[in-house]
């Protein structure tokens, strides 16, 4: 086996092995590069940025970190900033708000949608040294030593480092290796993926070419019974769309349905006559498709993110519905906060070039990192979980709230989104961006109450009304 972490005894620098050339993994690579920490990225695919039909939303909290890293200009050149949000209901009613424009004014960054492939290409191409990224390097095991770890790959190579970061997605190998280590070391509770990740919805996502009646900067959400469509009209009129479908039952992680191209076509054809916007049908958008894919949507947040010299970030630790556009942004934040934690552990010590944190030092640091991230992630997970069910009119309460409350909230939607954005991570070891807005301070919830009580109060009120209605109905039926 070829040892590509060779002569580590002579290598004085602390080294991080990042597994996964994902948005989280490549963002972390940029963060480490800026701070001067050595790293290598291992990616199992042959290429970093394949075209899979996926789009990605960059909210101001993700955009701020990318701006600090000098990467947001690439994003901005590829997007049309969102300016208007439109809600469409099955009874023909429509409502409109300028909350995307308000968010940009408050935070200094637009709501941006672009091809996921474009973002990955930018993250990769702008690395100072792309030779640190190794493709065709699928990880099969992580071995532990007293002061380091060794990562073994299918191409018969091994990579040594002092910290392994799993940024390898929902089907994470590093997560399994972390739990294997936790079990053998009796450190923490080994979590069951099947109990932590559930699947209630599927999604067909795709990109379509321009339609003359759809204007760049539109965000359109179509509410329907048991399904919904979220779409964004981007640069040059290209439409990024997500068709969400409630499944016939809830599945566990290991029961996840497998979908084919034919499944996606059948579902889209079945709903093609439904209104998309104004006189445009979903079929009009679907007929202009460039790429599309169907996938189950996992939902869940893991409790244990680290063990010893292993930590996991991004989709390997949390997965939630795309409806609020925070998935990639949370991955970017994870990378930023992990880099902050590493920067603090190095800055807090009298050190020379040979300083390397001990395993207990790293474990304590990673526990603090996890504690800081998990509370924020859980809050956003709850909002996303509510959003997908609200838009798919999942039950009477969701139907009434979506139709008779959401269109009349005015600036409340922008205020809620602002509170979700304002407490996003910022890189502590780099200057804050010059472009900014007052929203970061105004809407910070670090010393305030969260949005959740208000939302729950609305739902509780609806529940009370429904109970009263049910009682009155039963009374009149009996009389």
UniProtKB/Swiss-Prot annotation:
Location in the cell: Membrane
Residues with attached carbohydrate: 156, 198
Species this protein is from: Talaromyces verruculosus (Penicillium verruculosum)
Database matches in Gene3D superfamilies: FAD/NAD(P)-binding domain
Binding site for FAD: 43, 57, 116, 315, 328
Main subcellular location of this protein, as a coarse class: membrane
UniProt GO cellular component terms: membrane
InterPro entries, A to Z: FAD-bd, FAD/NAD-bd_sf, FAD_mOase_fung
Bilayer-crossing regions: 453-473
Gene: cdmI
GO biological process: terpenoid biosynthetic process
Biotechnological utility: Compounds in the chrodrimanin family such as chrodrimanin A or verruculide A exhibit strong inhibitory activities against protein tyrosine phosphatase 1B (PTP1B) and therefore, they could potentially be developed into drugs for the treatment of type 2 diabetes or obesity. Furthermore, chrodrimanin B, the end product of the pathway involving chrodrimanin A or verruculide A, does not exhibit the PTP1B inhibitory activity, while it functions as a potent blocker of insect GABA-gated chloride channels.
Record-given protein name: FAD-dependent monooxygenase cdmI
Enzyme class: oxidoreductase
Pfam family, one: FAD_binding_3
Catalysed transformations (reactions): verruculide C + AH2 + O2 = verruculide C epoxide + A + H2O
Family membership: Belongs to the paxM FAD-dependent monooxygenase family.
């Amino acid at each position: 086996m070829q040892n590509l972490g060779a002569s580590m005894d002579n290598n004085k620098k602390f080294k991080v092995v990042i597994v996964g050339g994902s948005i989280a993994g490549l963002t972390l690579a940029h963060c480490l590069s800026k701070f001067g920490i050595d790293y290598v990225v291992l990616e199992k695919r042959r290429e970093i940025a394949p075209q899979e039909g996926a789009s990605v939303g960059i909210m101001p909290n993700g955009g701020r970190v990318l701006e600090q890293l000098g990467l947001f200009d690439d994003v901005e050149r590829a997007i049309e900033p969102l300016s208007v949000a439109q809600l469409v209901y099955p009874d023909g009613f429509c409502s409109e708000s300028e909350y995307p424009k308000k968010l940009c004014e408050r935070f200094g960054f637009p709501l941006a949608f672009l091809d996921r492939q474009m973002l990955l290409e930018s993250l990769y191409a702008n690395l100072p040294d792309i030779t640190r990224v190794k493709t065709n390097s699928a990880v099969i095991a992580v071995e532990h030593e007293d002061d380091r770890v060794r990562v073994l790959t299918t191409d018969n190579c091994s990579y040594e480092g002092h910290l392994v970061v799993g940024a390898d997605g929902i089907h994470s190998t590093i997560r399994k290796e972390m739990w294997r280590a936790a079990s053998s070391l009796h450190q923490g509770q080994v979590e069951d993926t099947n109990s932590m990740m559930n699947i209630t919805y599927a999604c067909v996502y795709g990109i379509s070419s321009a339609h003359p009646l759809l204007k760049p900067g539109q965000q359109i959400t179509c509410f329907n019974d048991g399904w919904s469509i979220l779409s964004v009209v981007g640069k040059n009129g290209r439409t990024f769309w997500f068709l969400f479908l409630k499944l016939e039952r809830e599945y566990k992680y290991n029961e996840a349905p497998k979908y084919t191209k034919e499944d996606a076509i059948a579902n889209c054809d079945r709903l093609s006559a439904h209104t998309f916007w104004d006189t445009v049908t979903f079929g009009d958008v679907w007929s202009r498709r460039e790429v599309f894919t169907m996938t189950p949507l996992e939902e869940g947040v893991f409790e244990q993110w680290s063990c010893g010299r292993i930590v996991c970030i991004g989709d390997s630790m949390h997965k939630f519905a795309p409806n609020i556009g925070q998935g990639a942004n949370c991955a970017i934040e994870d990378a930023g906060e992990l880099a902050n934690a590493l920067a603090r552990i190095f800055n807090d010590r009298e050190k020379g070039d040979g300083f390397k944190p001990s395993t207990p030092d790293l474990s304590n640091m990673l526990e603090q990192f996890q504690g800081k991230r998990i509370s924020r992630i859980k809050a956003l997970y709850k909002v996303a979980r509510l959003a997908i069910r609200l838009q798919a009119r999942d039950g009477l309460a969701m139907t009434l709230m979506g139709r008779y409350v959401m269109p009349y909230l005015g600036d409340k939607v922008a205020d809620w989104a602002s509170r979700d954005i304002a407490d996003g991570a910022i890189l502590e070891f780099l200057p804050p961006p010059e472009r900014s807005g007052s929203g970061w301070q105004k809407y910070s919830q670090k010393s305030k109450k969260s949005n959740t009580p208000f939302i729950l109060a609305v739902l509780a009120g609806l529940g009370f009304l429904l109970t009263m209605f049910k009682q009155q109905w039963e009374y009149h039926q009996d009389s």
